[in-house]
C-alpha cells in the first residue's frame, strides 16, 4: 500500500513522461512489496508528482544544471526486506530517468528514500490499519503474514507514558 511522492523541478517531465510515471509507479511499488496488483490494491497506492520552481531547488548551493529528483516511498513496516528495497529503488530510478528522457545516463540525480511506517501508525478512513491487518486485507499468503507478525513483535513500539 505504497504512497509515492516525487519532488522534481518544473518541466522535468513532458506530458507523456508524467502519464507513464503516474500509471506505472504504484504497480511497481506494490509488486516489490509483494502485493498483487489489481484494481483494489491500485486504488490505495497513490503517486504524487510534486513540481517545484527550478529556482527553489539547488545542488550544493548552486542552480541546477540537470534535473534532480527526491522520491519518498512510504510503506508499512514488515512488507520490505533488503532485496525488495534494492529492487524497488532500481526500478523506480530507471522509471524516472526514462520518463525524463535521460535513461542510462547515470542515476546520481535520483534519491529514493524508503519510509517504513511503524505498525499501528497508518490510518485509513479514520481507522488505524496495523501492518498485519493490512497484509491479511490485501491477501498476502498466511505464512508470510505470520513471519511479518513475528518480526514486528520482536521490535515493539516505544510508547512514552503521557502521565
Region annotations inferred by a language model:
Residues 1-163:
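A domain-level signal for the structural core that forms small-molecule/cofactor-binding pockets
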Amino acid at each position: 500500500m505504497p504512497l509515492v511522492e516525487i519532488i522534481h523541478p518544473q518541466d522535468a517531465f513532458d506530458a507523456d513522461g508524467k502519464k507513464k510515471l503516474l500509471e506505472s509507479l504504484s504497480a511497481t511499488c506494490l509488486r516489490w512489496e509483494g502485493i498483487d496488483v489489481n484494481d483494489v490494491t491500485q486504488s490505495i497506492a497513490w503517486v504524487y508528482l510534486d513540481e517545484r520552481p527550478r529556482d527553489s531547488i539547488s545542488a550544493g548551493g548552486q542552480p541546477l544544471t540537470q534535473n534532480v529528483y527526491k522520491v519518498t516511498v512510504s510503506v508499512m513496516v514488515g512488507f520490505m526486506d533488503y532485496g525488495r528495497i534494492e529492487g524497488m529503488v532500481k526500478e523506480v530510478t530507471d522509471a524516472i530517468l526514462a520518463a525524463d528522457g535521460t535513461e542510462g545516463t547515470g542515476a546520481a540525480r535520483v534519491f529514493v528514500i524508503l519510509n517504513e511506517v511503524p505498525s499501528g501508525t497508518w490510518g485509513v478512513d479514520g481507522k488505524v490499519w496495523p501492518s498485519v491487518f493490512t497484509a491479511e486485507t490485501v491477501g498476502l499468503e498466511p505464512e508470510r503474514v505470520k513471519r511479518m507478525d513475528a518480526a514486528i513483535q520482536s521490535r515493539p513500539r516505544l510508547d512514552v507514558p503521557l502521565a
